[in-house]
Amino acid sequence: MIEPVQVLWSPAGTSMPSLGDRALVDVTDGDTPNIRMPIRMLSVDTPEVTARTPEGAAAVDEKFAQLAEWIDQGKAPISAGLAADLHPRLATGRAGTLQFEQGKQASAFAKHNVETRLARPGQEPRNLFIRVTETPFDDHGRLLAYIAPNYSPKELETLSRAERSTFNLDLLTAGWAAPFVIFPSIPGELDLPLLVGAAAQARAAGTGIWSDPATLPAYEYRAMEKLYSITKKIVAGEPVRGADRFAWRDRYCADMRSRQLHGPEDYGAVPPEYRLWIWSRDVAAAVDRLNLVPAPALVGAA
């Protein structure tokens, strides 16, 4: 029989956050099992390979071409401004294939870059340096982090911030990722200019994904997959009402240069490298913490 305890922290019926299931790698000691965990690299978004095969990508080609037709016919729930921007890239007949091919190239670059920068001749490869932000996990249980080679204090004394760049930054520099900074996980004051500069230079030079004007950044590709599914239901006469019609977009966008906040379909007014994405649920907090100013369209002035 134990004595009654007087400390209450988690009321009955509540539970700790879950990260789902993970593969056990080994057990170091009694209280230290090691698991395998995926990392979602912060502030970057590489092309998707969810089509899995060239045939799967070709199927997306057809879906997006069909979506372009529905947009022409006014059947898709999308604003005229964003539709005008996206339509030419959806109507190419190769939007899915382009995304898949770019995704494979981005993966190959990332693998080669990691192996090269971690390698030490005659020694074991370097460990990874991992830095997380105030929101350590995403909704899929992935660790949100910046990763880089782990250098010794002596080595760090001789390296500039650019020379000890994160693998996240390397993807932007090579043009194999679109910048994807999401509040509140914003790089620090010394790192954010590096990120913006790398992304701007890659886009201006037409490297990586920016070599093709028909490129859909991965966040647009995912949104268009959702918009296709919603529009397909609408065309089929299935009931899609209210907020469900616009479930394909749930992020606002702030311009890092002016702190102006734009609606979910007005991000085209901001160059990709200056886009700060904000989930709808976080808009109030972002406006308060960053002193954002609503764009005229958000307050009915345009």
Regions found by a protein language model. Give the residues of each.
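Small beta-barrel nucleic-acid-binding modules, primarily SNase/OB-fold domains
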Residues: 1-302
